[in-house]
Curated annotation (Swiss-Prot):
Keyword terms: Cytoplasm, FAD, Flavoprotein, NAD, tRNA processing
Record-listed NAD(+) binding positions: 273-287
Primary location group: cytoplasm
The name this protein goes by in its record: tRNA uridine 5-carboxymethylaminomethyl modification enzyme MnmG
Record keyword Kinase present: no
UniProt: FAD binding residues: 13-18, 125, 180, 370
Family: Belongs to the MnmG family.
Length: 627
């Protein structure tokens, strides 16, 4: 052919999932092609201008620890950075940043265009090329055929996407972009379970038409929190505040009077919306006892006048949207720049995927992002990185890799999806992780960077800096352990501790006291100086202060790993095993779990059923465990 058409990996879609997938595959050394309908929208923030949040910040940190792009791009584009749950324990602290949309998109595009082994081509994809149950390529709208050993589908809300604005609707992937109709039609022919989901976005407001005078101001933190473990690589952008306002009884009355014009409440929208990001009309119905709902007025950038009113997503008609907005304090004269809308789209049941995100039915085909039923940039990016990694490994003839629930929030995410599936857009929370004390934001690099280096995702610069940090932490812990203080020997120490020393004590024991933190301890003469690396200092404090809890959680994990690593045959009819109930047989045949651990998390699979499976594996000589 006159044009390169042979690749190791093809990624279809250039959103948050697709960009991470393409970068991961290319970083591993695989010849990668990213196919997108529009190069100018690579890395577009389609909804809110922010990244991170409870549970989501942990995902971004893990993406960064594995060499991914999202964290560094967010740091470069940040116009406000905050730590959520700052007063709580380290397990639930989460970073969230407001972004300049334009800067973020430019950073993502620049990274993609300068990535070795990665080519970008602008063309919508209309079909996949299959040989029996093996995917071998993709066909674009203009008929070009590209071939690859593995393909990653990261098509977001574009599959037969339909935008709803009042009782009117039209085909679109998002506002201003056409839907993928042909590809959706072809994918429906595959032996995969499919459904419809819905999400929405609020109207955008011209900041010049808002009266901020009496609204509560919300500033970012100082110093500015960062996502990337590489630290600040650039001067920060000018920081901007957010503002807080509320709906009121008049707002709710307007919505109530116009519910018959809502496509959701008229039954026009079939897709299920996100439980944790409901539309404003959903909020006033579900929480009818509340007289007000909080709205965050978030700036969209340094050179933009647009404000994102976080909290009033809606698909009501434009005239109703205008009344709603103008009923809210500070927005009496508000000018809407873009109307809000809801969008419906196809998604595929993630239970049809292996934990590597490869299809169980079509070899070489990977799914990542909203196509798997998730919502959120961070969830999409995490899946994209994992799918891109495993698409590359498959192309090289290597075994797939995925983190377990005790290793990463990414592991929790893919296990929840591939084991339990989802009937509504899935959002990550810290509460979904049973081992969240071990899966903190602050230690994502300690958990994953070495693995990322072994997998070929982490470059030498990051690896070198990581090892320096690990060495610093161990040296500092040893230093504090070696400094001993006798009772009544130091007035400074006596003044900061609540109960006097009864015996000779070292720095490590002092740091275990709740009233003593690392910064305070290392400001005292016997323990000077403190580490210049603040991240390393934080690790010293957390590892020492929470050591007992961490040890107990690791012991709990060790007990669980026996089942987690006991593999089950993928192609097997469980009705052949005597002693299992019809319900258990049906669910096992439906889910096709890869291990006893995964089987145990399927609703309705009892401990007795797990015992029967274990006995059967032993009798058949099939008892084997993964590494």
């Amino acid at each position: 052919m006159f044009y390169p058409d042979q690749f190791d990996v093809i990624v279809i879609g250039g959103g948050h999932s697709g960009t991470e997938a393409a970068m991961a595959s290319a970083r591993m050394g695989c010849k990668t092609l990213l196919l997108t309908h529009n190069i100018d929208t690579l890395g577009q923030l389609s909804c809110n201008p922010a990244i991170g949040g409870i549970g989501k910040g942990q995902l971004v940190k893990e993406i960064d620890a594995l060499g991914g792009l999202m964290g560094m791009a967010a740091d470069k584009a940040s116009i406000q950075s905050r730590i959520l749950n700052a007063s709580k324990g380290p397990a639930v602290k989460s970073t969230r940043v407001q972004l300049d949309r334009t800067v973020y998109r430019k950073v993502i595009r620049s990274a993609l265009e300068n990535q070795t082994n990665l080519s970008i081509f602008q063309q919508p994809v209309d079909d996949l090329i299959l040989k029996n149950d093996l995917v071998v390529g993709a066909v674009t709208k203009m008929g070009l055929k590209f071939h690859a050993k593995s393909i990653v589908l990261t098509v977001g809300t574009f599959l037969d996407g339909k935008i709803h604005l009042g009782l009117e609707n039209y085909s679109a992937g998002r506002a201003g972009d056409t839907a993928s109709i042909s590809l959706a039609s072809q994918l429906r022919k595959l032996p995969l379970r499919i459904g419809r989901l819905k999400t929405g976005t609020p109207p955008r407001i011209d900041a010049r038409s808002i009266n901020f005078k009496n609204l509560k101001i919300q500033l970012g933190d100082t110093p500015l929190p960062l996502f990337s473990f590489l630290g600040r690589q650039h001067p920060p952008l000018t920081q901007k505040p957010c503002h807080i306002t509320y709906t009121n009884e008049k707002t709710h009355e307007i919505i109530q009077k116009n519910l018959e014009r809502s496509p959701m409440y008229r039954g026009i929208i079939d897709g299920i919306g996100p439980r944790y990001c409901p539309s404003i009309e959903d909020k006033i119905i579900r929480f009818s006892d509340r007289s007000a709902h909080q709205i965050f007025l978030e700036p969209e950038g340094l050179t933009s006048n647009e404000i994102y009113p976080n909290g009033i997503s809606t698909s009501l008609p434009f005239d109703v949207q205008l009344k709603i907005v103008r009923s809210i304090q500070g927005m009496k004269n508000a000018f809407i720049v873009r109307p809000g809308y809801a969008i419906e789209y196809d998604y595929f049941d993630p239970r049809d995927l292996k934990p590597t995100l490869e299809s169980k039915h079509i070899q070489g085909l990977f799914f990542a992002g909203q196509i798997n039923g998730t919502t959120g940039y961070e969830e999409a990016a995490a899946q994209g990185l994992l799918a891109g990694l495993n698409a590359g490994r498959l192309a090289r003839g290597e075994e797939g890799w995925f983190p377990l629930r005790n290793q990463a929030y990414i592991g929790v995410l893919v296990d929840d999806l591939t084991t339990l599936g989802t009937q509504e857009p899935y959002r990550m929370f810290t509460s979904r992780a049973e081992y969240r004390l071990l899966l903190r934001e602050d230690n994502a690099d300690l958990r994953l960077t070495e693995i990322g280096y072994q997998l070929g995702l982490v470059d030498e610069n990051r690896w070198c800096r990581f090892n320096q940090k690990v060495e610093l932490i161990e040296q500092e812990k040893q230093r504090l352990r070696s400094i001993w203080i006798k009772p009544n020997s130091d007035n400074q120490i006596d003044q900061i501790i609540k109960s006097p020393l009864s015996r000779e004590t070292n720095g490590e024991d002092l740091l275990r006291r709740p009233e003593v933190n690392y910064s305070l301890l290392t400001s005292l003469k016997p323990f000077l100086p403190s580490l210049e690396n603040n991240e390393a200092g934080m690790q010293v404090e957390i590892q020492i202060k929470y050591e007992g809890y961490i040890v107990r959680q690791k012991e709990e994990i060790a007990k669980q790993l026996r089942n987690e690593n006991t593999l089950l045959p993928l192609s097997f009819d469980y009705s052949l095993i005597s002693g299992l109930s019809n319900e258990v047989v049906s669910k096992l045949n439906d889910h096709k779990p890869i291990s006893l651990g995964q089987a145990s998390r399927i609703s309705g699979i009892t401990p007795a059923a797990i015992s029967i499976l274990l006995v059967w594996l032993k009798k058949q000589g099939l008892l084997r465990r993964s590494a």
